[in-house]
Amino acid sequence: MTDRVDISRLLSDMRALKAQTQVFQRPEALRGEGLHNGMRTLEGVEQPTKVPSFGDLMTQAVSKVNETQKASSAMADAYERGVAGVDITDVMIASQKSSIAFQATVQVRNKLIEAYRDVMNMPI
């Protein structure tokens, strides 16, 4: 039960998050060569996909942190019970991953609160 970092999986996760957060998409091909009243027509261009809201992204991030902590706890419990295949190094790595994920979440929360206070203290 090893949970090693797989660089290709990490890169694909990062690409998926980037694709989710892109608000504006450039059309791949513009059809309608000529100008019509000074503007090009955008025939055949796909409508942009629904972009997840900030709240949805935060909910997903907190859920992933929660899953990481649950996995770390389950691995520690398995090690304490003496389950074969669970090594102390894997337990410690999982524990550190969950700790770092939680600390990052707390820092994001602190920055959000600080930004909110800055906005609220701005003069009108």
From Swiss-Prot:
Q: Which UniProt keywords apply?
A: Bacterial flagellum
Its chief place of residence is: other
Query: What are the GO cellular component annotations?
Result: bacterial-type flagellum basal body
Q: Which one of the record's GO molecular function terms can you name? A: structural molecule activity
Gene Ontology process terms (BP):
bacterial-type flagellum-dependent cell motility
Q: Which family does it belong to?
A: Belongs to the FliE family.
Protein name per its UniProtKB record: Flagellar hook-basal body complex protein FliE
Naturally occurring in which organism (per UniProt): Cellvibrio japonicus (strain Ueda107)
